[in-house]
Regions:
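Short, glycine/charge-rich beta-strand/loop segments that flank catalytic centers
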Residues: 85-89, 116-132
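Well-ordered, non-membrane alpha-helical segments in soluble/globular domains
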Residues: 99-105
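N-terminal, Lys/Arg-enriched amphipathic/low-complexity engagement segments
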Residues: 104, 111-113, 120
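Flexible glycine-rich active-site/ligand-binding loops centered on an Asp-His dyad
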Residues: 183-191
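C-terminal accessory/tail domains of diverse enzymes
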Residues: 1-98, 109-110, 114, 155, ...
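Acidic, His- and aromatic-enriched active-site or binding-groove loops in soluble protein domains
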Residues: 136-159
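An acidic/histidine-cluster motif and surrounding catalytic segment
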Residues: 164
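Inter-helical turn/loop segments and adjacent helix faces that build the functional surface
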Residues: 167-179, 191-197, 263
Length: 365
C-alpha cells in the first residue's frame, strides 16, 4: 500500500478584546509574540519544522506577518497578520488532526489570557489591501524578485488559509510533479468545500471566497517539493520548490483552501487529496491555476452546474481510489455529505451574520 504522512499548517485570525478584528493596523508583533512566548517549545519539533532565517518560527506556533529588512539584509521588524499553527509530520490523517486540535486549544487558552480571541476566516473582513510602507530599500527589492512567491508575498497579509501537506513515500520526482499538476487543475472544483471568506471591506462582498478571488493567478494552488539537484519546473506561480529540510522531499502541499473553523474538515480534505493522488483515471492537468475559473468559483461556489459536476467527478474518483483505506473512505464520505448539503463555512458565516450575530468582528447594520 502506498504510504503517506501528513501535516497541517493553519493560519489563525484574531479578535481584539472589544470584539473587533485584529490585524496589521491595530496589533503589534510584540503583542502576538507574547502569546507565542507563553506556549511550550519542543526541540523535537525542529526535525520536521523549518525555523527560517529570521528565527521567528522556533515553535509549532509563530507570528505570521510581513518581514522587513535593512539595507544589509538584517531583519528590522515583522508586521503582524495573525498566528500560525504547524503540526509535525504524522503517520496518519487522524494523528495530524488530533495534533492540530490540541495545539489550537493551547493557543486559544494563551490568547484568551491576554484578552485576544482566535477565529478562523479566509480573508481580512475589514481591510482588503496591505500597502508596503515604507517603500522597499535596494536589498528588499532584490530579495523580493527571487521567486514568484516573494514578488506576491504582500497579498498573504489579508488572506488566511491552510497548507495541507502529504509526504509521499517512495514517489519519483516525475510522479510528484504530475500529482501537483493534477491538484492544480482540479483546484477550482475542490476549493468551494472550504470557502470561508464572504466578507471584505466591512461587509458581505457578494461571493463566498474573497481569498480565492485575490490570490489565484498570483499564488500557487499546489507545490511539489523536490530534492536538491532535481530540475525545477519553470512556472509563475511556482509548481515546484526545492526542499529546505530532508522531510520536505516528496511533499505535496495544497495551498488553495480557505482557513477552516473545523479541524475535522481539514481531515476530510486531506483524505480527498490522498484519493486524488492515488487515482489513475482523471486526465486533468495544469501547470498553473486557472485564474478565471477560480474567480468564478469564488463568487458562485457550487451554484454553477459545471463546477458541481467537476467536484462530483473528483469525489467519485477519490472514493474509488480509497476503497482499501477505510478511514480515508469514511472521511471522504463525510465530505460528500457536506457537498450534497452545499455546506461551507462561508454559508454558515453569512447565515449567522444575517441573523444578527457578530461574525469576525462584523455585525449587520
Amino acid at each position: 500500500m502506498t504510504r503517506f504522512r501528513y501535516g497541517i499548517e493553519h493560519e489563525c485570525a484574531l479578535l481584539r478584546p472589544d470584539g473587533s478584528f485584529a490585524d496589521f493596523t491595530n496589533t503589534t508583533f510584540d503583542e502576538l509574540q507574547d502569546i507565542v512566548d507563553a506556549l511550550p517549545e519542543d526541540p523535537a519539533d525542529l526535525a520536521d519544522l523549518r525555523v527560517g532565517d529570521a528565527g521567528i518560527k522556533r515553535k509549532r506556533w509563530y507570528v505570521e506577518g510581513y518581514e522587513r529588512f535593512d539595507e544589509h539584509g538584517a531583519l528590522l521588524r515583522c508586521v503582524p497578520k495573525g498566528l500560525e499553527i504547524r503540526t509535525r509530520i504524522h503517520p496518519s490523517v487522524e494523528a495530524a488532526v488530533a495534533a492540530l486540535r490540541a495545539d489550537q486549544q493551547r493557543l486559544d487558552t494563551a490568547a484568551a489570557a491576554r484578552g485576544l480571541g482566535v477565529t478562523a476566516i479566509g480573508f481580512n473582513p475589514v481591510h482588503s489591501e496591505y500597502v508596503v510602507e515604507p517603500a522597499f530599500n535596494a536589498w528588499e527589492r532584490r530579495h523580493r524578485r527571487v521567486t514568484p512567491e516573494e514578488r506576491t508575498a504582500h497579498l498573504h497579509m489579508v488572506t488566511y488559509g491552510p497548507d495541507l501537506n502529504l509526504s509521499w513515500a517512495g514517489s519519483t520526482p516525475d510522479a510528484l510533479v504530475d500529482a501537483a499538476r493534477k491538484l492544480t487543475a482540479l483546484s477550482p472544483y475542490l476549493v468551494p468545500l472550504s470557502f470561508s471568506s464572504p466578507f471584505r471591506d466591512g461587509g458581505p462582498w457578494g461571493g463566498l471566497s474573497a481569498r480565492t478571488a485575490l490570490r489565484t493567478g498570483a499564488r500557487p494552488a499546489a507545490l511539489a517539493f523536490l530534492a536538491d539537484g532535481v530540475p525545477q519546473v519553470s512556472a509563475e506561480p511556482s509548481l515546484t520548490q526545492r526542499a529546505r529540510l530532508p522531510p520536505e522531499v516528496g511533499r505535496l502541499e495544497f495551498k488553495a483552501f480557505d482557513s477552516c473553523p473545523d479541524a475535522a474538515l481539514y481531515g476530510e480534505l486531506l483524505s480527498l487529496l490522498t484519493g486524488l493522488v492515488l487515482d489513475t483515471t482523471l486526465p486533468q492537468r495544469r501547470t498553473t491555476p486557472d485564474t478565471a475559473l477560480h474567480r468564478h468559483a469564488a463568487r458562485v461556489g457550487y451554484g454553477d452546474p459545471a463546477l458541481r459536476a467537476g467536484a462530483e467527478q473528483a469525489l467519485d474518483a477519490a472514493a474509488a481510489a480509497l476503497a482499501d483505506r477505510p478511514a480515508d473512505s469514511a472521511r471522504v464520505e463525510s465530505l460528500r455529505a457536506r457537498f450534497d448539503r452545499d455546506e461551507s463555512p462561508a454559508r454558515a458565516m453569512l447565515a449567522r451574520y444575517d441573523a444578527g450575530d457578530t461574525v469576525a468582528g462584523l455585525r449587520r447594520p
